[in-house]
Amino acid sequence: MAKKKSEEHSGADANDSDYQEEPNFEDPPGFVDNISDEDLLGDMLAQRPSEADGVESVVVVDNIPKVEPERLDKLKLVINKLFSNYGDIVNVVYPVDEDGKTKGYAFMEYKQASQAEEAVKKLNNHRLDKNHTFAVNLFTDFQKYENIPEKWEPPTVQTFKVQSDLYNFINDPDTYDQYCVAAETAPNCVQVGFWQNVLPEPFELETRERFTDTFVKWSPLGTYVVTFHKPGVAIWGGSSFQKIQKFPHPGTQFVEFSPCENYLVTYGPTPTGQKIIIWDIRTGAEKRSFVADGMSVLSMFRWSHDDKFVARMGENSIHIYETPSFFLLDLKSIKIPGIRGFSWSPTDNVIAYWVEEQNQIPARVTLMEIPKKREIRNKNLFHVADCKLHWQKSGDYLCVKVDRYSKLKKDKKDLDVKFLGMFYNFEIFHMREKEIPVDSVEIRELILAFAWEPIGNKFSIIHGEQNSSNVSFYEVNKGVKPSLVKRLEKKSCTHLFWSPRGQFIVMANLTMGTFEFVDSTNDYIISASPDHFRASEVEWDPTGRYVVTGVSSWKVKEDTGFNMYTFQGRIIKRTILKNFVQFLWRPRPPTLLGEEKQKEIKKNLKKYYAAFEQKDRLRLTRASKELLEKRSQLRETFMEYRNKRIAEWADQKSRRIMLRGHVDTDNLETDEVDEEIVEFLVKEEVTLLE
């Protein structure tokens, strides 16, 4: 109880009016407080030590093999190697029975609790072998499960969100294609516009400000468009491009869709290398993640055409994972000593890989059938410096470009290998023929580019000197060696772009911005040779009707924009866009019509010509009428503005006269103006005539 001042200062004046007795804060006798300590001091009580303190960094591993004492050391080595990838392990306990045999579980203590949480996240449900799959939990989880309430409460019902039609873009009756145009409006701020390529002028579908930080990318079938942000990436779709799913992966620099759009792979840097995460697109769940040592090459994963398998190359091996479990195929990698590269067939579950020369053993190209892992074709190659694998889009052919040498020189000091007398071979595998025969084409000049015709049996190459190269076209037929059908000499092109439908090809020089359009069925005649200075990209639309060339601000800062051409090279649209960075046609899914139905339509195509031509005429007439109406409206708007300004100018006449010394300068006669011509000598030259 607080003491009174009168007691503390006995000599004080009791009648002092400024003196007041201090309040008494003690509870009266028998008082019962109805406020609990948790309500009153909850924030402080939350910090008090608990029984779980000290075990937050302990994990419990169930379903480990039960082994005898003589095999325990080997088991510890395997499990410790696996769990030490996620932190420093300070203590491990393997309980054993009376006979010294392990009981099938173990306790592991990490140095930090965060390391234990990461181990649980990554190794729970990890499959050690066909009989043992880990169940990994934090030690503190047992307390959580003990405190489960006895009375069950049903979960809250979440309202169903109706998702818009993701495939409405292919329902257009006139089958107009869509495209997106990206322009950087500020650092890390890119505006993206979506357009429909309607004739005679494209129609704007949607424009999004600050849609992405860097660039956008379409999914293989055109269902989604992906955007990049600091926290991760997001995919959008539907008629108004709504957000469908987001994937948290900070610093993502590159993404890759599986061919059937079931999975998304994100690549992002870490302080020690690069982290790769595979996501389920529909659920947004993380299926599996990998940490690569060093900055690995982007797109290190290769998908099978049907999304059933995904593969990556390791040291002297290929790792093939099955979906949707993402476990290794048959729980083990395929050992291939000396492997240097591999690629999936675009239409079949067949992997092509090549092995370098080793100890007098020749290099080898192998075709392997998955999941049987059966080698269906081998081809030995000698004096090989490098190989590149090129599949034709239809999967009918595989071309292996082989860089060969005549002489090998090794430097004893730095162990560098120099290849002398280089020449090149094209090994053509006929995938649809019995026993897969292989043809060879030898080229003695430097190969600058190679491209298959997507639908057809031709391929083209650029060879020779860079400033004056030749373009050769070869045709591949059953039972005969590939034949040279045309050579275009002295062409300064650097890239080849076939139409998605075949037949037409663009030979491009992306250094100078020059292009040549070639028809491969009409004696390879060059139909047009347009220029687009500093153009750095070429994009065919999915139907092969239009080609776009673009000048990106990633390369230059002035005159950025894009041009649109017909497949014959006729310019139909020029667009100058400040800070233009990207143009992408929206891909189309494959047709649902069978081959017989497609053949029937092609056979009877002439029947539809009249209807198509009439529709085109009506469209052009409607467009002309709309253009005239638009011009008339613009003229009326201008005349209205002009008359308004004339009236305003007339109202200000008195003010002008006053400012100009009471002289009406509006009606001065031109006769009062004197015109004087003055001539003067500028230069004098003297010429002597002999």
Swiss-Prot record:
Keywords: Coiled coil, Cytoplasm, Initiation factor, Protein biosynthesis, Repeat, RNA-binding, WD repeat. WD repeats lie at residues 207-246, 293-331, 334-369, 442-484, 530-575. Residues 1-11 have a biased composition (Basic and acidic residues). SUPFAM superfamilies: RNA-binding domain, RBD, Tricorn protease domain 2. Residues 1-36 are annotated as: Disordered. GO terms for molecular function: RNA binding; translation initiation factor activity; translation initiation factor binding. SMART domains: RRM. Transmembrane segments: none annotated. CDD domains: RRM_eIF3B. Residues 595-645 form a coiled coil. GO terms for biological process: follicle cell of egg chamber development; formation of cytoplasmic translation initiation complex; regulation of translational initiation. It is found in: Cytoplasm. The keyword NADP does not apply. Residues 57-141 form the RRM domain. Residues 15-25 have a biased composition (Acidic residues). Its main location: cytoplasm. InterPro entries: EIF3B, eIF3B_RRM, Nucleotide-bd_a/b_plait_sf, RBD_domain_sf, RRM_dom, TIF_beta_prop-like, WD40/YVTN_repeat-like_dom_sf. Pfam families: eIF2A, RRM_1. One of its GO terms (cellular component) is eukaryotic 48S preinitiation complex. The keyword Protein biosynthesis applies. Belongs to the eIF-3 subunit B family. RNA-binding component of the eukaryotic translation initiation factor 3 (eIF-3) complex, which is involved in protein synthesis of a specialized repertoire of mRNAs and, together with other initiation factors, stimulates binding of mRNA and methionyl-tRNAi to the 40S ribosome. The eIF-3 complex specifically targets and initiates translation of a subset of mRNAs involved in cell proliferation. Component of the eukaryotic translation initiation factor 3 (eIF-3) complex. The eIF-3 complex interacts with pix. Interacts with mxt. This is Eukaryotic translation initiation factor 3 subunit B. The gene is eIF3b.
